[in-house]
UniProtKB/Swiss-Prot annotation:
It comes from Aeromonas hydrophila subsp. hydrophila (strain ATCC 7966 / DSM 30187 / BCRC 13018 / CCUG 14551 / JCM 1027 / KCTC 2358 / NCIMB 9240 / NCTC 8049). It holds the Pfam family CsrA. A key translational regulator that binds mRNA to regulate translation initiation and/or mRNA stability. Mediates global changes in gene expression, shifting from rapid growth to stress survival by linking envelope stress, the stringent response and the catabolite repression systems. Usually binds in the 5'-UTR; binding at or near the Shine-Dalgarno sequence prevents ribosome-binding, repressing translation, binding elsewhere in the 5'-UTR can activate translation and/or stabilize the mRNA. Its function is antagonized by small RNA(s). One of its GO terms (cellular component) is cytosol. PANTHER family: CARBON STORAGE REGULATOR. It comes from the Bacteria. This is Translational regulator CsrA. Keywords: Activator, Cytoplasm, Repressor, RNA-binding, Translation regulation. The gene is csrA.
């Protein structure tokens, strides 16, 4: 796992098209903004896990 330190307003790049910006920090919560192309899915981990659990086995999604 890569661990980075960023301050509010600073951005990191993932590949050429995805940016993650620290928008704010309040207590133990960090607000981040993600800018990615429409074809790149971005979910919180708990939402992604729910989506995966709801997929029907053998369903391709196409």
């Amino acid at each position: 796992m890569l661990i980075l330190t960023r301050r509010v307003g600073e951005t990191l790049m993932i590949g050429d098209e995805v940016t993650v910006t620290v928008l704010g920090v309040k207590g133990n919560q960090v607000r981040i903004g993600v800018n990615a192309p429409k074809e790149v899915s971005v979910h919180r981990e708990e939402i992604y896990q729910r989506i995966q659990a709801e997929k029907v086995p053998g369903q391709s999604g196409f």
